[in-house]
């Protein structure tokens, strides 16, 4: 008689449950029990009821509000609790950790079988309009993280994840219960954790890219900041590279003209990608747009990635591409491919590639649409890649756009262009609106690609505009590159039409959208809002980590040994930034913080005096 191994049985059960909504509800209920409040005062109960009455759960755009500190209330030491209560909570935490460990074990087994070929392709955008963006002046918000420097960190799991009854009551009343919701757009709240100048200002024309732990934003443009930079003789574009840590929801200025001598000046409508945890940019334009273009490649090293910060311009030779902006780039094997772009006057769809081993450029295809069936020249298109073809989505010229129904794709093996007819989403068809189930032709939109659990490559596009600058989009669509089928995401939509923004995705299947120009009531304003959307149901351990960081955005205050002893797997603790030291004087900002050259100096001084 064959007896089922208990360990194998556990793996089978978890594998069957991880993709079910029942188990997701179990996780949410379990987390709620962990953070339950045993004693709530009358004032706290009234505050909780008031907050719950004002909570709107029907919006597609949900804001994860962070708990606010009560003004004027001094920090209190953790009160003594009954041993029974402490033991119960400790057991609850240990159970959650064991669940996360089991999920991590399952994930590691799956990772050995998976051979993901995710390639995130990002490139720049540009615009020549002169709208002005309001400068944010959020005050620095002190939190309970700011304790005396001499206070020793507790290594107990209870002190890492559990707080006093008062703090738990505030958490229960001010933070909605965590709920994992795929294909829902969520606004990331980060401003209350920074002083003015401690996060990127509103911008367009920037590019973002993501690793497992950080989001990176390079360059961009804002006319208001450009005027200030002009008066001081600085670059009129944002000559800076920012990083955003997903776990702590904090921004950090990694590089700028002050600490990186080789920082490029063509930082609008460039292309940005990540390869072996190194950022690579190509092309771009300075300001005024089209007057100064680039065909250089730059490599960026950041402290967030554990490297010595710096920027290097690659030394290349061979048949270099034309200096232009608005191309799309893909890394295939050891080659960097670039397709399309514009000098400001001429538009191309030529294909070049750079051998990253030798630094030699090679022209592999010159498009001649007037002579053969080649795609017409364009910029502000997006490119996605399935290992055999590079698909070119949309894009256009200064007055035209290209459709998303018949898609040109460069064949990497045959060195030619193929065309693929796509299939519509019949649910999204609207005869009155002229929509036949396809996304409308557009440019200046964003696109990321992700490999689903079935192995299919899926491309997600958001926002954009048409060539006449009169129609703007806030919709989100998905294209399956295997079936060539379009699907409109019905559960998520941008809060307002958005263009000249940028998007990126992390390997766990989460998409991020940052910045851009917002169109509302015939007014256009640049933004620095950050949104996230899970494109798929990730691994169970990823959901557990997302829930932990939702309730605890200060894990970087604890040393890694404490977190490992609490049961958090090493691959998650490695996503945290370097451990912060608790500062003695909470009225002064961190001296190691780099302040953006484009911040408002008067507002920055007033908030730190």
Curated annotation (Swiss-Prot):
Kelch repeats: 214-277, 279-334, 335-381, 389-437, 458-508, 510-554
Gene name for this UniProt entry: slim
Keywords recorded for this protein, A-Z: Kelch repeat, Repeat
Subunit and partners: Interacts with Elongin-C; may be the substrate recognition component of an E3 ubiquitin ligase complex.
Function: Activates the Pk92B/DASK1-MAPK signaling cascade.
Protein name: Kelch domain-containing protein 10 homolog
Pfam families given in the database record: Kelch_4 (PF13418), Kelch_KLHDC2_KLHL20_DRC7 (PF24681)
Record's GO cellular component terms: Cul2-RING ubiquitin ligase complex
Species the sequence originates in: Drosophila melanogaster (Fruit fly)
Signal peptide: none
Region of interest (Disordered), residue spans: 103-146, 576-609
Any GO BP annotation: positive regulation of stress-activated MAPK cascade
Cystine pairings recorded for this chain: none
Bias kind Acidic residues: ranges: 104-137
């Amino acid at each position: 008689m064959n007896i089922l191994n208990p360990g194998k049985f556990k793996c089978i059960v978890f594998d069957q449950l991880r993709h079910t909504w029942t188990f997701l509800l179990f996780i949410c209920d379990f987390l709620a029990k962990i953070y339950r409040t045993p004693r709530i005062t009358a004032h706290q109960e009234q505050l909780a009821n008031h907050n719950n009455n004002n909570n709107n759960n029907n919006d597609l755009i949900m804001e994860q509000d962070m708990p606010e500190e009560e003004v004027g209330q001094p920090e209190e030491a953790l009160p003594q609790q009954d041993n029974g209560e402490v033991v119960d909570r400790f057991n609850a935490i240990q159970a959650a950790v064991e669940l996360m460990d089991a999920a991590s074990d399952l994930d590691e087994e799956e990772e050995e079988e998976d051979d993901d070929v995710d390639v995130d392709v990002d490139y720049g955008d540009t615009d020549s309009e002169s709208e002005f963006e309001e400068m944010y002046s959020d005050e620095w918000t002190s939190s309970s993280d700011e304790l005396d420097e001499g206070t020793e960190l507790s290594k107990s799991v209870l002190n890492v994840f559990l707080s006093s009854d008062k703090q738990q009551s505030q958490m229960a009343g001010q933070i909605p219960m965590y709920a994992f919701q795929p294909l829902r757009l969520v606004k990331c709240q980060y401003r209350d954790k920074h002083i003015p100048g401690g996060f990127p200002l509103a911008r367009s024309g920037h590019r973002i890219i993501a690793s497992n732990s950080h989001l990176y934003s390079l360059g961009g443009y804002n006319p208001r900041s450009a005027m200030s930079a002009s008066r001081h003789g600085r670059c009129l574009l944002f000559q800076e590279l920012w990083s955003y840590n997903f776990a702590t929801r904090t921004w950090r200025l990694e590089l700028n003209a002050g600490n990186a001598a080789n920082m490029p000046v063509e930082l609008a409508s460039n292309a940005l990608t990540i390869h072996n945890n190194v950022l690579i940019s190509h092309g771009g334009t300075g300001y005024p747009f089209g007057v100064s273009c680039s065909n250089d490649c730059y490599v960026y090293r950041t402290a967030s990635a554990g490297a010595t910060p710096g920027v290097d311009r690659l030394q290349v030779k061979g048949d270099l591409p034309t200096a232009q902006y608005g191309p799309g780039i893909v890394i295939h094997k050891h080659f960097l491919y670039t397709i399309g772009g514009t000098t400001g006057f001429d538009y191309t769809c030529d294909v070049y590639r750079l051998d990253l081993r030798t630094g030699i450029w090679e022209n592999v295809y010159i498009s001649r649409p007037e002579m053969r069936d080649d795609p017409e020249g364009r910029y502000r298109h997006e490119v996605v890649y399935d290992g055999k073809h590079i698909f070119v989505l949309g894009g256009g010229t200064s007055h035209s756009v290209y459709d998303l129904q018949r898609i040109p794709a460069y064949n990497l093996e045959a060195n030619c262009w193929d065309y693929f007819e796509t299939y519509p989403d019949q649910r999204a068809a609207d005869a009155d609106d002229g929509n036949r189930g396809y996304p409308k032709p557009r440019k200046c939109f964003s696109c990321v690609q992700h490999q689903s659990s079935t192995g299919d490559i899926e491309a997600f596009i958001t926002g954009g505009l048409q060539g006449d600058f009169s129609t703007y989009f806030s919709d989100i669509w998905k294209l399956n590159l295997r079936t060539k089928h379009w699907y409109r995401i019905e559960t998520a939509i941008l809060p307002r039409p958005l263009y000249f923004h940028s998007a990126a995705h992390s390997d766990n299947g989460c998409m991020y959208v940052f910045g851009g120009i917002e169109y509302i009531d015939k007014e256009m304003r640049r933004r620095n809002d950050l949104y996230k959307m899970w494109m798929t149901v990730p691994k169970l351990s990823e959901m557990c980590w997302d829930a932990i960081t939702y309730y605890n955005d200060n894990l970087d205050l604890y040393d890694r040994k404490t977190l490992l002893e609490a049961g958090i797997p090493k691959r998650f603790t490695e996503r945290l930034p370097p451990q912060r030291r608790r500062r003695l004087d909470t009225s002064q900002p961190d001296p190691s913080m780099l302040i953006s050259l484009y911040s408002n100096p008067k507002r920055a001084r007033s908030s730190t005096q």
